[in-house]
Design a protein with these regions (language model features):
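Catalytic cores of carbohydrate-active enzymes
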Residues: 1-66, 115-147, 173
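A structural signal for short secondary-structure junctions
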Residues: 17, 84-87, 105-109, 144-145
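Structural helix-adjacent loops and short alpha-helical linkers that scaffold large soluble proteins
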Residues: 27-41, 95-110, 155-168
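C-terminal substrate/ligand-recognition segments
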Residues: 68-102, 151-155
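Short amphipathic alpha-helical interaction segments
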Residues: 79-83, 101, 105, 117, ...
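Extracellular low-complexity, Gly/Ser/Thr-rich intrinsically disordered linkers
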Residues: 90, 102, 106-116, 148-149
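Ser/Thr/Asn(+Pro)-rich, low-complexity disordered segments
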Residues: 98-100, 109, 131-134, 140-141, ...
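Acidic, low-complexity intrinsically disordered tails
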Residues: 169-176
Length: 176
């Protein structure tokens, strides 16, 4: 899906970004259901990492694999590849709409956060990560929206149970 239509100078932006997942994940999706599967597949193949979704796919113009350097360099990378942990929530929502009987795969998408609970800020999840391995945590080391979306997704993948033993359940997730 285009990220921007009728943008600057009338140009459409066809860069692969995570915004397209919202067209499916919303309570009332705005994308025709016949298009859900291809969007999910593209996001899974090009944007999904063990710690969230990249803000821009590798190979796209201006892609930045690392969020480092001086302030100007970090600002340039912020939305050009940097992984946002909180985006795992909308991805899991969309995945479960397309694959309602595949909670196991949805749970596996959360497996990369297991190690994050023991690094950066123990018991929490960082705001952002580098876009390439080893997915170094960056930004705020204890980001509320990152934690909230991982926990919300964990509850969804466990069939909606309200009580979740966070550390134990995340630790039980196997990652391929």
């Amino acid at each position: 899906l285009y990220d921007v239509v009728d943008g600057e100078n009338g140009r459409d932006d066809c860069a692969c970004r995570p915004n397209q997942i919202f067209a499916i994940s919303l309570d009332h999706p705005i994308l025709d259901q016949a298009r859900w599967q291809p969007v999910i597949q593209i996001v899974k193949d090009r944007l999904l990492t063990p710690v969230g979704l990249r803000s821009l796919a590798p190979g796209e113009h201006d892609y930045k694999p690392r969020y480092d350097g001086d302030l100007r360099a970090r600002d340039a990378a912020y939305h050009q590849g940097t992984v946002w942990a909180w985006l795992i929530g909308p991805f899991v929502d969309a995945w479960l709409k397309v694959h309602p009987d595949d909670r196991a795969s949805a749970a596996e998408f959360l497996g990369g956060f297991r190690s994050q609970l023991r690094t950066a800020c123990v018991g929490s999840i960082s705001e952002i990560f580098d876009a390439e391995p080893p997915y170094t945590p960056r930004g705020c080391c204890a980001q509320a929206w990152s934690v909230a979306e991982v926990l919300r997704s964990l509850v969804k993948t466990r069939g909606g149970r309200e009580k979740v033993e966070t550390t134990n359940e995340l630790s039980s997730v196997t990652v391929a």
